[in-house]
Amino acid sequence: MTSVFKSPSTYVQGRNVTTDIGTHAESLGDTALLVADEIVMDMIESDVHESLAEAGLDGSSVVFNGESSEDEIERIASVAVDEGADIVIGAGGGKALDTAKAVREEVGGAMVSMPTIASMDAPTSSLSVIYSEHGEFEDYWYYEQHPDLVIVDTEVVAAAPARFLRSGIADGLATWFEADAVAQSGGDNEVGGKPTRAGHKLAELCYETLREHGAGALDAVEHDAVTESVDAVIEANTLLSGLGFESGGLAAAHSVHNGLTQLAETHDATHGEKVNIGTITQLVLEGHSDARIEEFIEFSVELGLPVTLGEIGITNPEQVDLDVVAEAACDEAETIHDEPFDVTPAMVRDALLTADEMGRRVRDR
């Protein structure tokens, strides 16, 4: 049995660290390409390029169009080659960062991950989630290299809408349940080996941190405030969840998310919002007690996370083809098969409907 743990080379988190990116990146190369959508570009472009210039680095920018699709990756890779970039900086949300990772894989050089929201655990990982141009999950692309640098400006993250931090909490909560399932099944993690004890414990620490600080952090960011709880939750959503899911492993929750993306009705829900439905579904699949499942649903409701299919856009579950979701969740390449028992599409469909009913009952009582 071979256990594997991998991580980024450097992780930096703090107030206003955007202006320090040049200091941290100067040893990585000579010419940087900033990849971000228009909103993020307006927020950080001048600070990033000023810091790069102060460190003696050349820099240029390209606007990310919104989907981490194969076509978008090819387009931006072409820009990187034309600009002679040997550092790719991905800034923004998970899809921008995953696109930047894929571009680095194609053109070589170094990669800097610069999340402006703490809505997911993509910043630290060595994989990209690939979607169609219409937002449907297609594949995971795995890489040998992690980001060389992850830099998280807590001022920027706290100023983003609270929904993003809330979404990241949902993604982070799933990390523990999935890593624990993989540990029980003896399955593989996301970096090519069996989970390490460190990966498992980091996933558990992520869960404990979010339970302890989640509500307070959400209160703070409603006022764009950075507190100890905000710092703790940003680290949990980004670093602990990222290391925990890669080196601990994924199971049913993210497979259910991937299945849900097949329905256009869910495309306005964030990654984490769909994952939260996946977590409740996983708990049902695994046969946890009603009390355990209801306790998780109650905490989700306290944080404002979705606990029913209606809250992620599926207003009439009985009239929607949930078999499409279940079949996609059980694709042979999916991590749902790292659960400690065999899972079938019929089981997933029934668990989704049961999770939805339990969520509605607990939310409305």
From Swiss-Prot:
It is an enzyme of class 1 (oxidoreductase). NAD(+) binds at residues 37, 94-95, 116, 119, 125, 127, 131. Gene3D superfamilies: 3.40.50.1970, Dehydroquinate synthase-like - alpha domain (1.20.1090.10). The keyword Transmembrane helix does not apply. The keyword Zinc applies. CDD domains: GlyDH. Its cofactor is Zn(2+). Its EC number is 1.1.1.-. InterPro entries: ADH_Fe/GldA, ADH_Fe_CS, Glycerol_DH. It comes from the Archaea. Binds 1 zinc ion per subunit. Signal peptide: none annotated. Is subject to substrate inhibition. It catalyses: ethylene glycol + NAD(+) = glycolaldehyde + NADH + H(+). Keywords: Metal-binding, NAD, Oxidoreductase, Plasmid, Zinc. Transmembrane segments: none annotated. One of its GO terms (molecular function) is metal ion binding. Optimum pH is around 6. Zn(2+) binds at residues 171, 254, 271. Optimum temperature is 40 degrees Celsius. It holds the Pfam family Fe-ADH. Oxidoreductase involved in the non-carboxylating pentose bisphosphate pathway, a nucleoside degradation pathway present in some halophilic archaea. Catalyzes the reduction of glycolaldehyde to ethylene glycol. Cannot catalyze the oxidation of glycerol 1-phosphate nor the reduction of dihydroxyacetone phosphate (DHAP). This is Glycolaldehyde reductase.
